[in-house]
Amino acid sequence: MKVSELKRLLKSYGCYEIASGKEHDVWYSPQNGARVRIPRHQSREVPNGTLKSILKQVGIQ
């Protein structure tokens, strides 16, 4: 899954961006109050371990 697709998925679950950094953006999940860092490389694939970790932190998986 690409970073842009991940961000689209997070938005569909009600998550939103709360901060932008040089290499990562910070997103907030209102479902459980979690904050996760998302890499800013829009066209790159997110590594499977990173993707699973992000989805677990926001309560999607």
Stretch-by-stretch model annotation:
Residues K2-S20, Y28-Q61:
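Basic nucleic-acid-binding interfaces
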